Amino acid sequence: MSGIIATYVIHDDSHNLTKKAEQIALGLTIGSWTHLPHLLQKQLKQHKGNVVHVEELPQQEEVNNYLGKKVTKGIIKIQYPSLNFSPDLPAILTTAFGKLSLDGEIKLIDLTFSDDLKRQFSGPKFGIEEVRKRLHVHNRPLLMSIFKGMIGRNIGYLKTQLRDQAIGGVDIVKDDEILFENALTPLEKRVRSGKEVLQSVYETYGHRTLYAVNITGRTYDVKENAKRAVNAGADLLLFNAFAYGLDVLQLLAEDQDINVPIMAHPAISGAYTSSKLYGFSHSLLLGKLLRYAGADFSLFPSPYGNVALEKKDALQIAETLTIVDSHLKRSFPVPSAGIHPGFVPFILRDFGNDVVINAGGGIHGHPNGAQGGGKAFRAAIDATLQGTPLHEVDDADLHTALQLWGNPSREVKI
């Protein structure tokens, strides 16, 4: 049947999950059923939500203690017919988790789209393979760094930072998500100056680096700002997808004039995903929905750094971004936050080759500057791909980084 199947984790104090599931299925569709006249039931049957799965899970005493009451935990799945909503994410999310998100301890962990509905979403315009083609990098993870400390700094500072990161071997440099339109580094000037620097580095060193510029402004202006960036020569766009909404991301991704990959930043998403009792699962919001909405890259907290996700959650995000789908291109997973070269073996072990290693302080904080930081990461990536333990690598920049931040992979079998 055409539509969506929503999967929820519920903690219910009525202790009747089947009844609760039926109430949700009716409440979010036709409202009631048993008291309807038979003729009206026949008319409304195609609009009725249907419970397709109910499963009770083991009790968790810590949850009962937290809530101050005893609850029954379970998984419920409800099918919502596509006749009830238009084929767009705002309508789908409001149907499956609109007022329901306000109704007690319930968390939306997955949405399964029927094939006909999925075809309404074109997904990433470029995806992993096309990004690799643009960089001419096919056999290793990509390395990305972040502009740090740009607020209050001018274009000259940006050019110096960008040059050092590119010389260090970084593949992508992105704006900080908190760098908005300002008089010192306006959008088009950032793009043109960045392109000039990166072209110079390419001609001198033979290394190609792409620059992801942050697209900001009022929602009404975002599309025009993105086109301004593209017309100025932007390689990639960074977008705070959850500050604006998934539908705005999709609007940008589907515009044929915005012909560059889009990188979705997870800012604000923690308010939706962090609770085990409420909101969305990490894999749904930062994985599946971003991919459907057209993100070519999805940034999310890694399991290793200073804003860590549980490993299973991070891996589920990556899986939903990269699982082969005949309709959707794959998106790059970008585990982030607190990453230094000593974590590289873990990242490759856990996420494989199709991943972007994203570092801020782990590059800029290197004693030899951003050039040294980039070179340390590249040495760590090359060594890991060759099966060489990092402490055995004869590379001065990597050795310095391991001395400064440690080498957690040394004592662990990778």
From Swiss-Prot:
Top-level taxon in the UniProt lineage: Bacteria
EC number: 5.3.2.5
Cofactor: Mg(2+)
Matching SUPFAM superfamilies: RuBisCo, C-terminal domain, RuBisCO, large subunit, small (N-terminal) domain
Reactions this protein catalyses: 5-methylsulfanyl-2,3-dioxopentyl phosphate = 2-hydroxy-5-methylsulfanyl-3-oxopent-1-enyl phosphate
Keywords, ordered alphabetically: Amino-acid biosynthesis, Isomerase, Magnesium, Metal-binding, Methionine biosynthesis
InterPro entries: Diketo-Methiopentyl-P_enolase, RuBisCO, RuBisCO_lsu_C, RuBisCO_lsu_C_sf, RuBisCO_lsu_fd_N, RuBisCO_lsu_N_sf
Similarity annotation: Belongs to the RuBisCO large chain family. Type IV subfamily.
Subunit structure: Homodimer.
Function: Catalyzes the enolization of 2,3-diketo-5-methylthiopentyl-1-phosphate (DK-MTP-1-P) into 2-hydroxy-3-keto-5-methylthiopentenyl-1-phosphate (HK-MTPenyl-1-P).
Protein name: 2,3-diketo-5-methylthiopentyl-1-phosphate enolase
Species this chain originates from: Bacillus cytotoxicus (strain DSM 22905 / CIP 110041 / 391-98 / NVH 391-98)
Gene this chain is encoded by: mtnW
